[in-house]
Amino acid sequence: MAVISISRQFGAGGKTLGEAVALDLGYRFVHEGMLDKLACELADSHPQSAGCEFYAQAHLTNVLSSLGPADYLDYYIKQDDRLLSQEQHLGALNRVIKELAEMDNTVLLGRGSQFILRDHPGVLRILLVADQKSRVDFLIRRYGFSTGKAQGLLKRADKKRSRFLKLFFPREPNETSLYHMVLNTTWLSLDLAKGLILDLVKRMGV
């Protein structure tokens, strides 16, 4: 039983890899768009409640089941940038991520989970990187974007990731000492990367 936190450069294959790892392990997979929607609902439902530290697990599960695959790209294409400066949202996001970690058997993608869960036992922190050409090629191949659209989306995603993490977390997200494993998908196939993560889960016995 484990929680896997995947941080990645957009286009390095994090969502595809995270889904595959979760499927093989029988874990739930929760990406940025889902985490933001859970946090927004928590903030809306309990905006001033100091006594509500965590969502009930059943409620989290119900909300997760209502979120579809479109929520992932919506995070990069349609999200209101003002969300990134709201400390209330970060507080709710922090609580949601910690509650999901308590539920165990979860793969989390992004939103600072590598920082939020740094001292949480049983959490494996993975970083995916790739060069820009490989990331653009992946977006074209995986989502059918034109080269221009893929390049524009990559630039926007990198800017959002950098701004969010610099606002709320004190360390560089690509600092390798934060992670149990760093995988470069320029050189590694996603299938090989998945195998390495599964082997790490098994060897660490978490």
Predicted segments with their positions:
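Glycine-rich phosphate-binding P-loop
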Residues: S5-E19
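RNA pseudouridine synthases
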Residues: L100, G112-D119, F138
